[in-house]
Curated annotation (Swiss-Prot):
Residue numbers binding [4Fe-4S] cluster 1: C11, C14, C17, C58
Name this polypeptide is given: Photosystem I iron-sulfur center
GO molecular function, one term: electron transfer activity
Organism, as annotated: Prochlorococcus marinus (strain MIT 9301)
Subcellular location as annotated: Cellular thylakoid membrane
Role played: Apoprotein for the two 4Fe-4S centers FA and FB of photosystem I (PSI); essential for photochemical activity. FB is the terminal electron acceptor of PSI, donating electrons to ferredoxin. The C-terminus interacts with PsaA/B/D and helps assemble the protein into the PSI complex. Required for binding of PsaD and PsaE to PSI. PSI is a plastocyanin/cytochrome c6-ferredoxin oxidoreductase, converting photonic excitation into a charge separation, which transfers an electron from the donor P700 chlorophyll pair to the spectroscopically characterized acceptors A0, A1, FX, FA and FB in turn.
Residues that bind [4Fe-4S] cluster 2: C21, C48, C51, C54
Length: 81
């Protein structure tokens, strides 16, 4: 089952979320917006099972990665009208 995975620009490039994902949904890509020079990316969201291990692993105060399940996607990402 596919879930929406949102990476926020508060990502510090630490790779914790990538290492925590049991299905390799995430990867790091080059990005000049942080000191690490990389940011998490979610190219394989169709493989996401919604375990949210990536969220748990994120060390930032404001979670830099969020997994949205079903109807939660529309409400939480501001997509509901």
């Amino acid at each position: 089952m596919s879930h929406a995975v949102k990476i926020y620009d508060t990502c510090i490039g630490c790779t914790q979320c990538v290492r925590a994902c049991p299905l390799d949904v995430l990867e790091m890509v080059p990005w000049d917006g942080c000191k690490a020079g990389q940011i998490a990316s979610s190219p394989r969201t169709e493989d996401c099972v919604g375990c949210k291990r990536c969220e748990t692993a994120c060390p930032t105060d404001f979670l830099s990665i969020r997994v949205y399940l079903g109807d939660e996607t529309s409400r939480s990402m501001g997509l509901a009208y």
